[in-house]
């Protein structure tokens, strides 16, 4: 089954050109099934690009998924047209009385910003608290992982001296877990962050199950035992050229960034990289939708009981 989005959303034509199955709302209304309601809190500056990336992964599932886009920052965006935000995004006040099967909170370029200095930090705290009662399962990505660990577990912000950027090898620690079902024993995934997620810190201060880790990148995938929250510290949604764009951006800003590890052929930034993480990203999101959302969410969202023993 496809993702279900508004007819006019730019991602519709973009993803159809990639042969991704996207169903516009006008057609979806003719199917007599209840789609999964998934809310995406998009914190990235280039919102249309991020929409395309996450919708691509959510589309590769036998489940019909009804997408609602959420924003929290009311300031004028430099990277996304205001018309697009007004047409396709809702504010928290619009949905705070609703329930959702799933919530995805994206990353944000805030790795060196203290939580107290994040303009919309109070809104992040409010949404994470709200999700406990209104969402079956929440998936946090990259910076959102750091934010959620602080809010839910009191873990302070931990920052690397040098930005982690590139494609890193990962080891599946719990191959029988539902979220890692079908994972290879080792696989590649992108990272782009200053945040640090040491395995030993998570083991000491939380009861989260650490499912995947990396010797270089630390904990990559972990989740609560009741499947209400899951965390991925990398960017399995990234396009093949996303890291290249970030590298060129940082160069232009005079930040003297390191060349992303294991990304450009022969570490030559003039050569086009190749994606080596797509299959993992699709499998991760399919597993989350199936085992953490679909299998435990109630048919009637008015009666939330999102726990699986």
Swiss-Prot record:
Pathway per the UniProt entry: Amino-acid biosynthesis; L-methionine biosynthesis via de novo pathway; O-succinyl-L-homoserine from L-homoserine: step 1/1
GO process terms (BP): L-methionine biosynthetic process from homoserine via O-succinyl-L-homoserine and cystathionine
Catalysed reaction equations from the record: L-homoserine + succinyl-CoA = O-succinyl-L-homoserine + CoA
Superkingdom of origin organism: Bacteria
A GO molecular function held by the record: homoserine O-succinyltransferase activity
Marked site: Important for acyl-CoA specificity: 111
Protein's cellular compartments: Cytoplasm
Entry EC no(s): 2.3.1.46
Coiled coil: none
Cellular component GO terms held in the UniProt record: cytoplasm
Binding positions (substrate): 163, 192, 249
PANTHER family reported for this sequence: HOMOSERINE O-SUCCINYLTRANSFERASE (PTHR20919:SF0)
Family per similarity comment: Belongs to the MetA family.
NCBIfam families the UniProt entry points to: metA
Function, in words: Transfers a succinyl group from succinyl-CoA to L-homoserine, forming succinyl-L-homoserine.
Name of the featured protein: Homoserine O-succinyltransferase
Top-level taxonomy: Bacteria, Pseudomonadati, Pseudomonadota, Gammaproteobacteria, Enterobacterales
